[in-house]
Amino acid sequence: MFHADRIIVAFDGSENSKKALLTAIDLAKTVNAAITVAHSHDMKDNQTVIDPPRPAAEASYISGGMTSVPDPLISDVTSPEPMIYEDRTEEVIAEARMMLNEQQADGDIDILEGDPAESIIEHANRISADMIVTGSRDQNRLKKLIFGSVSEKLSAKSDIPVLIVK
């Protein structure tokens, strides 16, 4: 019979991660294990390259016969507001908490940073998890070929058993 003291669930708020959390809750209740919900984000994934707005005066450079437009100052280039990402994290955590409450399950919720697969494996080892539960990711073939999936990386790199829920 399977025995586990702690189960960690990779959770990003997607439908498949919700299925994974429900499966982990059922499994944890069956074997009397503690649950840790881990939401991992990679700040690099949140950063986008923004083509900064050109000053209105640009049109006069072009209409006046100048062939090149001066580059915007570095201070003109803005980066995405980190609050946008923090708001999404809070939303994901609230969803996980609500699901735990609805299922009358206790669990820790931890926010991790870095590559999702690597940070979840490191955290699973740190908390002595006996199993990692994750949802499978529906990706198109090209995206999967280029980036791989978190569930594939978890199963390939983890020494801890990984349950992939579809």
Swiss-Prot record:
Keyword rRNA-binding (UniProt): no
Cystine residue pairs: none
Keyword Cell wall biogenesis/degradation in record: no
Top-level lineage group: Bacteria
Induction text: By phosphate starvation, via the alternative sigma factor sigma-B.
Cross-referenced Gene3D superfamilies: HUPs (3.40.50.620)
Sequence similarity: Belongs to the universal stress protein A family.
Source lineage: Bacteria, Bacillati, Bacillota, Bacilli, Bacillales
Record's keyword terms, sorted: Stress response
Segments crossing the lipid bilayer: none
Protein name per UniProt: Stress response protein NhaX
Pfam assignment, any one: Usp
PANTHER family: STRESS RESPONSE PROTEIN NHAX, UNIVERSAL STRESS PROTEIN UP12
